[in-house]
Amino acid sequence: MKIFTSNQIHELDQYTIEHEPIRSIDLMERAAKTLARAISDMWTVETPMVTFAGPGNNGGDALAVSRLLAEQGYQITVYLFNIYQKLSDDCATNKQRIIESKRVKQFTEVTQEFDPPKLDSNTVVIDGLFGSGLNKPLSGGFASLVKYINQSAAKVVSIDMPSGLMTEDNTYNIRANIIKAHTTLTLQQKKLSFLFPENQQFIGKLKVLDIRLSAEGTEKIKAQYSIIEENDIRPLLMTRDPFAHKGTMGSALVVAGSFGMAGAAVMAAKACYRAGAGKVTVHTPRKNNEIVQISVPEAIVNLDHEETYIGTAIDTEDFDAMAIGPGIGQVETTAIAMISQVRRATCPVVADADALNIISNHRAWMQQLPKGIILTPHPKEFDRMNGSPCADSYERLSKARTMAEHLEAYIILKGLFSALCMPNGSVFFNQTGNAGMATAGSGDVLTGIITGLLARGYSQGDACKLGMYLHGLAGDIAAKELGEESMMATDLIKYLPKAFERLKD
């Protein structure tokens, strides 16, 4: 699913109007019917409703929705804010229609200060003040109204966007002036700002409504951002040759674990095997030998000459993919071995955890990373790589995109909607996964899965997309059977086979 910017949303609307063809007012009516149906599914006609409509097309949507609901018997009080005596054409048309219908309980056009109505816990507020076209923080009377609504006990349903929230960049927005919706009914596609954790408090329950915008237009408009869906993933899956053997299924190297952190090596290696690798070699300190041999008997163990930390780089000519970083620590000897290992790699590399922290501590080494390397930071790890904290998720994503292009790397910003930043500037969001995965070791498992897929022969981009999706899907299956509260990272490995099978069904 493509994610469009506010300008592209307008472009798609215009494409639909021109090529369907359909008048813009009729397209608004079609959207309003879909919105009204969704609202009537949530609340009965006995529910009192208050609509706050702005002067633009979002307000036009709200007026049309209110009229349609009133025609069904809902008792709706409508306020249209026309402070500057300038309505969009379609908003003006819907103002006239709502007046002529005489079905709403009360219609008030606000042209100056007004006393807001009482909003109690039985009331539903239809928020249609501002939508995807908003490009600056709310201020003045609109900001005061938003605060009044937020402080009330009413349930709020926002049309397309919670008023005050911008479609992409909210770095310098005033968060106190954004509607906190109970439900957001967004039109056609999710918006970029919906995928950032700091904005979840405004969105509430999200429903995406299909208003039948042009499929041809959607295909033609090039989007920088996309959400990975199951239909995108299924075609990527390789089949196993019935004549395959371990030598043809890919050989992976996992450089992981200092003494006391052998679990990171174990989880990455197990996940690597579960992702389909034919052979997995674990390079780890000597004191981890027994733990790794017992925990992953399938693995080949290559012991470092150091007892408790990794101090040497090994040859990678016999490997098809390499993971480095989980649990290796950050002592200087390990740091030197790590960058040497990465520089001399002859296969695709996945760098995670301490490998990323080492790079952050030796920023000049960043330019020595091989093209096509996969970096998998969580937010704090990325901020350290960036050299300074990011103000919010949008800024972090923007900087990660720039870094991925500059380094010609693949960067996965981990989180609820993990974002894969590609070397060409495009970004793919993963929508599988849940809060039960917020536990130590989940990142080691992701590293192992991606490395196993690389060893199998997937390209870096496909391995990242498939790896993120499978990782989250395994978590979703585990949560359904175990509950989020009690999940551990090893459960992701346990349920990875079921995730594969789900995709093959």
Would you name each region that the model predicts?
Residues 122-124, 129-223:
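Internal gly/pro-rich beta-alpha loop/helix module
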Residues 87-90, 141, 176-179, 488-491:
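Short acidic-hydrophobic sequence patches enriched in Asp/Glu that either
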Residues 112-114, 161-167, 192, 307-309, ...:
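Short acidic loop-to-helix transition motifs that present clustered carboxylates
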